[in-house]
Amino acid sequence: MNLQIKSFEEYEKVYRYSVENPKEFWAEIAETFYWRRKWYNVLDWNFKEPRIKWFEGARLNITENCLDRHIYNLGDTPAIIWEPNDPNEDYRMLTYKQLLDKVEQFAHVLKNNGVEKGDRVCIYLPMVPELVIAVLACARVGAVHSVVFGGFSAQSIADRINDADCRLVITSDGGFRGTKTIELKNIVDDALVQCKSVERVIVLTRTRTPVSMIKGRDVWWEDEIKKVETQGNPRFPAEEMNAEDMLFILYTSGSTGKPKGVVHTCGGYMVYTGYTFANAFQYQSGEVYFCTADIGWITGHSYIVYGPLSQGATSLMFEGIPTWPDAGRLWDIVDKHKVNIVYTAPTAIRSLMAAGDQYVEGKDLSSITKLGTVGEPINVEAWNWYNEKIGKGKAPIVDTWWQTETGGLLISPIAGVTPTVPGYAMLPLPGIQPILVDENGNEIEGNDVSGNLCIKFPWPGMLRTTYGDHERCRQTYFSAYENLYFTGDGCHRNEAGYYRITGRVDDVLNVSGHRIGTAEVENAINMHSDVVESAVVGYPHPVKGQGIYAFVIASGHHVDENLTRQDINQTVSRIIGAIAKPDKIQFVSGLPKTRSGKIMRRILRKIAEGDTANLGDVTTLLDPAVIEEIKTGAEKLKG
């Protein structure tokens, strides 16, 4: 089966086939990958439990598909191009052969440090090639990687290490991000005070930040590599895995409490990311593909590492941020490396658009043939700017909708093949069966309708469980509507049948394309000694898409609001990370609560949005007077 669809008629045909014969369809896609042993059963599923098994009985190692199988034809082709934070530092390039050598080397390092198949390894590294090497080396030895984004706090790392019982941590002395140096090793040291399971920490040299190395626990990456080199760099045969063995855990925010560890498995995830990458981006061999995400998020896992490498692509990764040294940095990278495909977030597009067109002018972007967006719905203005200024009206925009839990793209245009409309994710990819339902789970049929977006049939890339807590997986995704996977997103299907994602329908915010649970932020704010209670909602933000608005009841009457605001932001940064800091903090004497004590977030959301004319029925509130006070305070904050 050809992984790439070449016309709209073919899309309709393949889509129909994939929905009517899902097992045959996915088996044909899977045949294009390398398996040590084939499956005896393509799919076994039940959304009630939930139980999802793809390619049962099959044996493989994903790294043989991402590296070994390309060596004969593509050994000297660049696999990874790395662009550093500082434009004056040299870039690095690793061919498929070089990447395989380095992955095998580091697989030996992991083994030498006691890592066995099935062990969990926490990775807290900057965006450097060693991050890709560490991820693939874990997969090669059969260990489960849990990558933590370099912007998370010590507390967030400790929670993730303890939840997964990680034996080993891979980190760096520090990381560069714009003008900042982030002291990653020191943050890990703070985290590990709370972690009993960690036996070893491997530390990469990047920033030369002074760090303390704990004897018997901490070792340098470079020293460990030297040991393997003195043994003559032996090969490292990949560990044979079952298709349903765990590949990685990635933590994501939910509407309640602590982040949950989404589990993806070896076989299905490989097939799904490889297929969706090849098809949606219509990747042609020799193209340079640049995804600006961080590997600490699912986009980096699926569309910097596993998807592109499984297809023999050249994947460009960038250590820095789009706005440093100035807002032309991404376009300098495109110009320098003759990038063909750019995949970035609407937040980045909006901030670059706001900086002004002078940063685009004079850059040679003629190599670009395809563009993509990810992380949140894109507004029409940003879509048009991206299309005109970056794609010069010639590069189709693939506006992709998917989630950490889905493993890969679900609803998305296929570049140059299916139509595009600004702000629309358009049509489901083959094998994906979306359905809109009302509050009671009744299907909303026809077009020009809106509802809650669910998926009614499994696909190979979907999550299998939440680590150590299968019941939470069932409750979060499979209990709202019977026999459906509930996405947590609202959706509009227009008269032509195209899908537009309208945003979360639960208590989860999408800030700069990052998912943050309101409960998480509230819990962090409430840790501040001067805070009695808080409620957090989202509001429209010109750059981030959604901003974080916190309503806070402070103890005592004489609060220095500005000082307390700074303190609260520091508290949130310390507990979660800087990405969760509220954009607005409003002090209030009370919160709108029902008689049963439930906070009416709907009302707070409207006030935060500035939509105070129609707050709906407030008669059920315990103290309706508090609403007027909050409205007045919100006006003041705006002014």
Language-model features: locations:
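Conserved pre-ATP/AMP-binding loop-to-beta segment of ANL
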Residues: D76-P78, I202-V203, T209, I214-Y251, ...
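Conserved AMP-binding A3 loop
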Residues: Y91-K97, E239-E240, L247-V271
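AMP-binding/adenylate-forming catalytic core of the ANL superfamily
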Residues: V148-G174, V188, D335, V342, ...
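Conserved ATP/PPi-binding loop(s) of AMP-dependent carboxylate-activating enzymes
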Residues: L427-G431, N442-Y477, I516, T612
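AMP-binding/adenylate-forming catalytic domain of the ANL superfamily
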Residues: R200-T205, V543, R574-I599, D611-L637
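Gly/Ser/Thr-rich phosphate-binding loop
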Residues: E222-I225, A313, N340-T344, M353-P422, ...
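Conserved AMP-binding/adenylation subdomain of ANL enzymes
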Residues: G268-V288, I298-N340, A355
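Conserved AMP-binding/adenylate-forming core of the ANL superfamily
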Residues: T63, I80-L136, S153-A158, M213, ...
